[in-house]
Regions:
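Outer-membrane beta-barrel proteins
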Residues: 1-337
Length: 337
């Protein structure tokens, strides 16, 4: 990916380049644009043509003690911003990240299956699937261990008010929404040093939940799985559970996913994946299982990538009837700069 280093930034602020130089830092701008075509069977749709754009600002620098810092702000599809983070990496105790929307905690392993393009459920066909997110659903502080632990990585995230939105202004706090949730934490372990090509991962999340006439304990989530790469092929399997712990209604979700990808060469990749999710009610007669499967192909030509996905969804949005079953094809041309 080519970077537009400091060009766009100086256009935003003429004095920013001199400020960056004085602090031994830099600001880079990267972006992408995608043209899409989506066709759904057995579903009434509007115009199948679509477009997506993104722009990411990344700044970094170094302190006198050898610690480094970075900031990342992502803008997607005309949004004010989609995600942002401020990180401080120390030489000995790891990286501390102040994060909003960047996939921290257990959210980083909600779907780790190998793919040529997107998650099985993320190809614009629409599934309504519920995956684990933990405190990554709002502003949180994340710590990642140093890289010299024999292939073991530890990620810990904490939020003083989970799933309560974010304070995006200077010295501001988020608003309060109608939720009974309090503080929460996530812990994730990843290990890639046991054998060549093998990566195993596991995570746990717990969020304080006010015990009321509707709930009966804290909201918890777990996830575990592994991927194994051999030659150009990568295989993966994982399970996860999101426990809402309510007395009536949807009590928890049980998910399992598996997939395989194959890199034919440096430019062409193929994949097949399945993600199943069972919605469990306190009244088991209302239980429903959603299943999404997707065959994907991606082909890169320098800064351009063509992506194709054929996705089938059974019982979308956990509808036990066949009314929400759908099949769709998505074709994307992505241009990166």
């Amino acid at each position: 990916m080519n970077k537009l280093t400091k060009i766009g930034v100086s256009a935003l602020c003429g004095s920013l380049a001199s400020v960056a130089a004085a602090n031994a830092g830099s600001m880079d701008v990267t972006g992408a644009a995608s043209a899409t075509y989506t066709s759904l069977s057995d579903t009434v749709v509007g115009n199948p043509l679509g477009m997506a754009t993104s722009m990411t600002f990344t700044g970094n620098g170094e302190l006198d003690n050898g610690s480094t810092f970075s900031v990342s702000i992502a803008h997607n599809n005309k949004a004010a911003y989609s995600s942002s983070s401020i990180a401080l990496t120390t030489p000995s105790i790891g990286t501390f990240t102040y994060d909003e929307g960047g996939g921290t905690g257990i959210d980083r392993i909600d779907d780790m299956m190998p793919t040529a393009w997107e998650e099985t459920w993320g190809t614009a066909v629409g599934t309504g699937i519920q995956t684990v997110s933990g405190v990554g659903g709002g502003m949180n502080i994340n710590w990642t261990s140093t890289a010299d632990m024999g292939g073991l990585s530890i990620h810990a995230a904490y939020s003083p008010q989970a799933k309560q939105g974010s304070g995006t202004n200077d010295k501001a706090s988020s608003g309060v929404n109608a939720t009974s949730m309090g503080s929460g934490y996530d812990i994730v372990l990843e290990h890639s040093g046991l054998m060549d090509g093998l990566n195993i991962f596991a995570g746990y999340s717990s969020i304080d939940q006010l015990t009321t006439g509707h709930t009966e304990g804290d909201r918890t989530a777990t996830a575990a799985g592994a991927t194994y790469a051999i030659g150009g092929a990568t295989l993966g399997y994982q399970v996860s559970k999101d426990s809402l712990n309510v007395l009536a209604g949807v009590n928890h979700y049980d998910n399992q996913a598996y997939g395989v990808s194959f890199a034919v060469n440096d430019d062409l990749t193929l994949s097949y994946g399945v993600h199943k999710s069972k919605q469990n009610h306190t009244n088991s007669a209302k239980d429903a299982e959603l299943e999404a499967s997707s065959i994907q192909v991606s082909y890169s030509m320098g800064g351009a990538t063509i992506k194709l996905a054929q996705t089938d969804v059974d019982h979308g949005a956990y509808d036990s009837s066949s009314a929400t079953d759908r099949s769709g094809t998505t074709l994307v041309l992505s241009l990166a700069f």
